A protein has these predicted regions:
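Metal-dependent nuclease catalytic regions and adjoining charged, substrate-binding loops involved
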Residues: 2-7, 135-292
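Metal-dependent nuclease catalytic cores that hydrolyze phosphodiester bonds in DNA/RNA
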Residues: 1-106, 113-127, 137, 150, ...
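Short, well-structured alpha-helical interface segments that form or flank functional binding sites
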Residues: 93, 124-131, 185, 264
């Protein structure tokens, strides 16, 4: 991967964030398994052509630094332990931040946005935690609980004072119990995903199915019932049919279509430029400057 330095960051920082391949050949990490098949394959095939800018890696660097600090603290738990299990031709891997052997609690440190807490968007963390728990069970260690300790990098004391439903501290803890049924479902999810990835590798870049709506962080198109002279919508509907009915009932004058977005494709996918779905559906055409 090529690391650019558009903001002229110190070379020491650029050297630190310059990426090496996340997965060794033939391995899939717990976090990689959460990505779409298309992203996984394109990232692997085009790794040496991908670009990232050093300035975009500031927050991931904070996360790395925090993990490093916590790893060095002395307690009875073991930290940054790697586990792996062979599944067909792939080795599934995971690195556990902290494991309390006495209480069988797995802990993971996160640096994230306050909005993740506000939206209650923890499905990916749960899948990651259960994958770790499954890996550990295959290696002879039981996990009764997964606990994610999140540092909220954009927390605002002012907002916390104003809004009782806003996270009141810059730390949030998400945890859940691990059941045998969870582990069985996790193994099935992992094996199904690996079969899907294996099939995707047999196809050309453009022939691989697009990532799912969930994997693209896609939002649906909405239909806003508007009224002349009013800035905000009378109502925002999920379909044009509902919007037309609301327009008639509420005295609206027009319907404003608000297209859905694939937010990960637009702003966060590292291999978007090699993806035909991104090129055809997300990428905005370049504007041509006409000489005066």
């Amino acid at each position: 991967m090529i690391t650019t330095n558009k903001m002229h960051m110190p070379q020491a920082f650029v050297n630190f964030v310059s990426n090496t391949r996340h997965n060794a050949p033939g391995t899939l990490s717990a976090t990689t398994l959460l990505q779409g098949d298309k992203q996984i394959v394109l990232f692997d095939r085009h790794f040496d052509e991908l670009e990232q800018d050093a300035a975009d890696l500031v927050w991931p660097t904070f996360g790395t630094a925090f993990h490093s600090v916590m790893e060095k603290q002395n307690d009875d738990a073991f930290k940054e332990e790697a586990f792996s299990v062979q599944v067909d031709r792939w080795k599934v891997t995971g690195r556990v931040d902290r494991y309390d052997l006495e209480n069988e609690v797995l802990e993971d440190w996160k640096t994230t946005s306050v909005w993740k807490v506000i939206y209650g968007d923890f499905k990916d963390w749960k899948a990651q935690g259960l994958t770790y728990a499954w890996l550990m069970k295959q290696n002879g260690l039981n996990v009764q609980k997964c606990r994610f300790v999140a540092l909220l990098k954009d927390h605002s004391k002012t907002e916390a004072k104003r809004k009782p439903d806003y996270p009141q501290k810059p730390v949030f803890i998400y945890e859940f119990d691990v059941t045998e049924a969870d582990l069985e479902e996790t193994e099935e999810r992992i094996r199904t995903k690996i079969k899907s990835i294996t099939e995707a590798y047999k196809l050309g870049d453009d022939d691989i199915a697009p990532c799912t709506d969930e994997e693209r962080w896609a939002t649906a198109t909405k239909y806003a019932v508007m009224k002349d002279g009013r800035k905000t919508a009378l109502k925002v509907c999920d379909s044009m049919t509902d919007a037309e009915a609301c327009k008639e009932a509420m005295g609206g004058t027009r319907i404003e279509v608000r297209p859905g977005e694939s937010k990960k494709c637009a702003d966060y996918c590292p291999c978007a430029e090699f993806c035909n779905f991104y090129r055809d559906n997300v990428k905005k055409p370049e504007t041509e400057t006409v000489p005066m």
